[in-house]
Amino acid sequence: MARWRPDMAEREATPEALYLRRREFLALGAAGAVGLLVARGARAGEPSGAALQVARRVDQAGGETPTPWDSVTGYNNFYELGTSKEDPSRNAGSLRARPWTVTIAGEVKRPQTLDVDALVRMFPPEERVYRMRCVEAWSMVIPWVGFPLADLVRRLEPTSRAKYVAFQTLLDRDQLPGQRRPVLPWPYVEALRIDEATHPLALLAVGLYGRALPGQNGAPLRLVVPWKYGFKGAKSIVRITFLADRPHTTWNDAAPDEYGFYANVNPEVDHPRWSQARERRIGEFFRRKTLPFNGYAAEVAPLYAGLDLRKNY
């Protein structure tokens, strides 16, 4: 599996056509770029949204080709915006990502409420290319933009009692119309152990493909934990709480026999209704083998030494 590579080139993370067009934009300068947009119009399939300044780029997907923008932003699970894969992109316009604040509470020495833009200024974003494996046995490769969750945790100074970190999604039935239906117990909550939250791979994402997160992908702030199934990645986060005891989490409460608290990608532990041994990479015809911990076993397996991963799925 590919190791940390701080020298990854932009071309490696971006499909060639998009890479070349981005270089064309930069060569023209601001005024020329505006003219180019007017002349050509918006092109389907290209990243949209505000461009983000990225401090560095790191490929942690073993050189695998990133999933196209259209698929990453058009095939989503975000029940707050609808339960079909296409609903989130159709309904994302109702989500207002600014102004936005995140409340930090619980077992920390520095509880506070942070503006999301101030948060980004504190921690310069970097691009990380990660595999993403859904519990539904499909997967993508996504060039996220964000900062290590561990950096925020350290700044907040958790107390010695803090053993877990919970992440809560916005509760607003106007902005997130899917919350009008009781398909899940709202608001959505997910959580990590404190050692998982401080692992270098855990990311708070603010963008993808060099652009601000679209609403359907969890704007303006979402959790990315690449060795776990995608439902662990809380979207549109408004509250982060440090806790002494393991909290209730949404899918684990709704269907504990199907959605474990740990949710580590494990090809040897099947979902009750389907196998987890193989997965369908979006955009590919044939299914591929699922890797333990989604290919990140060398980095994260020591976190679970001595833990029965069949029982603690």
Curated annotation (Swiss-Prot):
Transmembrane segments: none annotated. Residues 1-44 form the signal peptide. It is found in: Periplasm. Pfam families: Oxidored_molyb. Mo-molybdopterin binds at residues 76, 79-80, 134, 169, 217, 222, 233-235. Predicted to be exported by the Tat system. The position of the signal peptide cleavage has not been experimentally proven. GO terms for molecular function: metal ion binding; molybdopterin cofactor binding; oxidoreductase activity, acting on a sulfur group of donors, quinone or similar compound as acceptor. One of its GO terms (biological process) is protein repair. Gene3D superfamilies: Oxidoreductase, molybdopterin-binding domain (3.90.420.10). Disulfide bonds: none annotated. It catalyses: L-methionyl-[protein] + a quinone + H2O = L-methionyl-(S)-S-oxide-[protein] + a quinol; L-methionyl-[protein] + a quinone + H2O = L-methionyl-(R)-S-oxide-[protein] + a quinol. Its cofactor is Mo-molybdopterin. One of its GO terms (cellular component) is periplasmic space. It is an enzyme of class 1 (oxidoreductase). PROSITE patterns: TAT. Heterodimer of a catalytic subunit (MsrP) and a heme-binding subunit (MsrQ). Part of the MsrPQ system that repairs oxidized periplasmic proteins containing methionine sulfoxide residues (Met-O), using respiratory chain electrons. Thus protects these proteins from oxidative-stress damage caused by reactive species of oxygen and chlorine generated by the host defense mechanisms. MsrPQ is essential for the maintenance of envelope integrity under bleach stress, rescuing a wide series of structurally unrelated periplasmic proteins from methionine oxidation. This is Protein-methionine-sulfoxide reductase catalytic subunit MsrP. It comes from Anaeromyxobacter sp. (strain K).
